[in-house]
């Protein structure tokens, strides 16, 4: 009877009173959480603006409403408060190249990934999205053999074959006087390489007339909702469960990507394991599904599709954008291009200009071009915090409690004038000078991160850069077409760097396009 009386009382509460109670409770909760974060939180003594310390609200405004511009606010915080700042209620950001290896450590210290950075794409079983240190170490161990130096050396002939195909597309655009998108062409190249490595076959993306394909469109589509999905992780989960007819209306590029993923899932592992080709049997997917030493829960088709989604994204757009930006700088610095060609032309002739990777890696100027390209392309630009789980960290006089996400930003590392004088300039010579003076400049290139969670595909990315750059640079003369510095200047940080809108330009914003002038 008492229970029924309570129910009747609740039902009879006026709507206005109920709304008032909810509103008052919300205000009390908000004010109490602000008070706690400002005056009682373990990070209360870390410098920074109070508006950032009270919660994620300032970050939400600059990342979601202003579209990936919190990086610039963090820069202002450092300018005002110093090298260590509190960028939200939970996270500390440090701008100090000498401290990078302490955060992104390769030692025995257990370091988890910041959970706030892994939920946006809803691939919870992928290695890159694995929060726990030990679990990540085990999952990475399954993949390491496929990305070892030896494994990439064995992949060289295939990369060369794909570069040869790409050169034929350069010739096709020359013959037909067509504009060539370097972003699209290089993305097709890297996608062919990574799909072959993961699935055991490539999809001939380099054959597509305009290099327009699902993987790239899907990635670019997801970057547009990345920051919103970080704050509302269920967003992508909901999108994945919508009927394709609905999803196509909301996000057509994402719907195509998810449809491809689901088709692979429906075919299942048995069909894949029945493949007899040597390419399939050497792939990551085949190896993982067939290896009985791996626990069954770690080699399900669903988990491998999560793994494949991340590897495809990480192995296509980031490397291809770096290639395109590097060529942009070479084309706007003809003296650098001349020096590169002279160095390449000094090599003994080999069939098809298919120089071994080991030879190319030892060319000083090419090495400088590649590293300067990685430096100015930045790669993944969003913060990716690490969490020391077992001990406090100390930065100068500040103690950072265990369990606190701590991050540094690649952009600040790559543009630090103390490390890279005149950081805005493309200067391959800086790497030659550093090598001569035995300055370890390479340790400040962090687009692949560092430590135990360094990008597993960095050896493949370097191989693609060296092999593609060496052959294309000496094969064709090209010139930029409707492309300026504004197309590569970073304004928005959405996983990778994006430029701002360019007045008067409505198409191909941020795309590096060229006309092929002649074969060399």
Curated annotation (Swiss-Prot):
Cell location: Membrane
Induction text: Expression is positively regulated by the trichothecene cluster-specific transcription activator TRI10.
Cofactor: heme
Binding site for heme: 455
GO cellular component: membrane
EC numbers for this chain: 1.-.-.-
Domain of life: Eukaryota
Membrane-spanning intervals of the chain: 10-30
Pfam families named among the record's database cross-references: p450
Topology in membrane: Single-pass membrane protein
Residues bearing attached sugar chains per UniProt: 447
Function: Cytochrome P450 monooxygenase; part of the core gene cluster that mediates the biosynthesis of trichothecenes, a very large family of chemically related bicyclic sesquiterpene compounds acting as mycotoxins, including T2-toxin. The biosynthesis of trichothecenes begins with the cyclization of farnesyl diphosphate to trichodiene and is catalyzed by the trichodiene synthase TRI5. Trichodiene undergoes a series of oxygenations catalyzed by the cytochrome P450 monooxygenase TRI4.
Protein name: Cytochrome P450 monooxygenase TRI4
Gene from which the chain derives: TRI4
């Amino acid at each position: 009877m008492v229970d029924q009386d309570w129910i009747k009382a609740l039902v009879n509460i006026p709507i206005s009173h109920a709304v008032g109670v909810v509103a008052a409770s919300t205000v009390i909760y908000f004010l109490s959480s602000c008070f706690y974060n400002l005056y009682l939180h373990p990070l209360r003594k870390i410098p920074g603006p109070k508006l950032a310390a009270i919660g994620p609200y300032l970050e939400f405004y600059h990342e979601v409403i202003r579209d990936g511009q919190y990086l610039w606010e963090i820069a202002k915080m450092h300018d005002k408060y110093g090298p260590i700042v509190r960028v939200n209620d939970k996270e500390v950001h440090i701008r100090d190249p000498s401290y990078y290896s302490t955060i992104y450590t390769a030692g025995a210290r257990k370091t988890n990934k910041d959970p706030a950075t892994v939920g946006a794409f809803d691939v919870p079983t992928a290695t890159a999205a694995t929060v726990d240190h030990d679990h990540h170490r085990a999952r990475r161990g399954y993949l390491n053999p496929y990305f070892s130096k030896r494994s990439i050396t064995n992949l060289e002939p295939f990369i060369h074959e794909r570069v040869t195909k790409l050169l034929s597309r350069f010739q096709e655009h020359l013959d037909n006087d067509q504009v060539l998108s370097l972003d699209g062409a290089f993305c097709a190249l890297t996608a062919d390489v990574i799909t072959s490595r993961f699935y055991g076959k490539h999809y001939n993306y380099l054959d597509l007339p305009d290099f327009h394909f699902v993987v790239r469109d899907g990635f670019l589509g997801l970057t547009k909702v990345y920051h919103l999905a970080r704050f509302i992780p269920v967003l992508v989960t909901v999108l994945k469960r919508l009927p394709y007819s609905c999803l196509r209306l909301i996000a057509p590029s994402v719907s195509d990507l998810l449809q491809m993923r689901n088709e692979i899932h429906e075919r299942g592992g048995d069909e894949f394991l029945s493949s007899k080709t040597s390419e399939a049997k050497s792939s990551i997917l085949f190896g993982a599904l067939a290896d009985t030493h791996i626990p069954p829960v770690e080699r399900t088709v669903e988990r491998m599709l999560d793994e494949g989604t991340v590897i495809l994204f990480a192995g296509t757009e980031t490397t291809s954008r770096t290639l395109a930006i590097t060529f942009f700088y070479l084309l706007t610095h003809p003296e650098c291009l001349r020096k590169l060609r002279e160095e390449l032309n000094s090599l003994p002739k080999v069939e098809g200009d298919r120089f071994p990777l080991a030879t190319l890696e030892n060319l000083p100027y090419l090495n400088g071009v590649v590293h300067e390209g990685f430096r100015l392309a930045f790669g993944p630009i969003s913060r990716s915090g690490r969490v020391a789980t077992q001990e406090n960290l100390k930065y100068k006089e500040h103690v950072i409690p265990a369990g606190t996400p701590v991050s540094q930003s690649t952009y600040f590392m790559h543009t630090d004038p103390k490390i890279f004088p005149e950081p805005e300039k493309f200067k391959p010579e800086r790497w030659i000078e550093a090598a001569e003076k035995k300055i370890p400049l390479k340790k400040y290139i962090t687009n692949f991160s560092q430590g135990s969670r360094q990008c597993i595909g960095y050896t493949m990315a370097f191989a693609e850069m060296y092999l593609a750059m060496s052959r294309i640079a000496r094969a064709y003369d090209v010139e930029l077409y409707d492309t300026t510095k504004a197309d590569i200047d970073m304004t928005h940080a959405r996983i990778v760097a994006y430029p701002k809108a360019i007045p008067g330009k409505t198409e191909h914003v941020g795309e590096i396009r060229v006309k092929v002038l002649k074969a060399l």
